[in-house]
């Protein structure tokens, strides 16, 4: 299963140049479907917000600081874990066999198991999993579960006037499960 689930991330190509990379946030939110480009966390479950991350860090290539195609919509946690990490000191060489953050090949390196935990498939994925984003110590399964529960709750809410009493109970159970998972995410600082 893909880290981003059903969401297909695609960047807009004709984005006007801005004088501050933070001005790209509204467009990034749309292009990244309101989820983290690295871990797939939806905005609804974060306790710390989202921000643009420079895929190629500024210390490696300062000329790309305002380049929209170099920005990733990232949850606070992924952005802080990645920081200025880049596998090589060469801006044009994104992969020395240790890591590759490029989205086209992302799914070949990382994915999710049937429970929603992130897993790696390659040595590149292992580096991202254990070093770049520290998925090995983060509650990724819980994040996946809560996003699925929120989606189910939203679907039920859309037909709330037609729900049976049994379905209303399911709605309340979903709400309770979401609140319990939110507590876990807060405690884990996600």
PLM regions and their residue ranges:
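Extended charged
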Residues: 1-9, 22-27, 43-45, 64-70, ...
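Sequence/structural segment immediately N-terminal to covalent heme-attachment motifs in c-type
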Residues: 28-32
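Conserved phosphate-binding loops in nucleotide/dinucleotide-binding enzymes
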Residues: 61
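Histidine-centered catalytic micro-motifs used for acid/base chemistry in nuclease
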Residues: 52-58, 75
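An N-terminal structural lobe/cap that precedes and organizes the functional/catalytic core
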Residues: 15-19, 35, 40-46, 51
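Residues immediately within or flanking Cys/His clusters that coordinate Zn2+
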Residues: 33, 72
């Amino acid at each position: 299963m893909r880290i981003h689930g059903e969401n297909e991330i695609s960047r807009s190509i004709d984005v006007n140049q801005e004088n501050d990379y933070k001005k790209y946030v509204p467009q990034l939110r749309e292009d990244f479907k309101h989820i983290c480009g690295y871990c797939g966390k939806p905005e609804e479950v974060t306790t710390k917000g989202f921000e643009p991350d420079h895929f190629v860090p500024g210390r490696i290539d300062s000329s790309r600081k305002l380049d929209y195609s170099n920005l990733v919509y990232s949850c606070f946690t992924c952005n802080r874990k990645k920081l200025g990490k880049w596998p090589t000191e060469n801006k044009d060489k994104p992969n020395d066999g240790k890591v590759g953050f490029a989205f086209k090949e992302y799914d070949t390196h990382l994915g999710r198991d049937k429970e929603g935990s992130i897993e790696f498939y390659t040595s590149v994925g292992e580096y991202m999993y254990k070093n770049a984003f520290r998925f090995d110590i983060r509650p990724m399964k819980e994040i996946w579960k809560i996003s699925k529960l929120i989606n189910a709750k939203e679907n039920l809410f859309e037909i709330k006037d037609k729900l049976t009493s049994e379905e209303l109970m399911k709605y309340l159970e979903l709400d309770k499960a979401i609140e319990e998972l939110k507590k876990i995410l807060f405690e884990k600082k996600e």
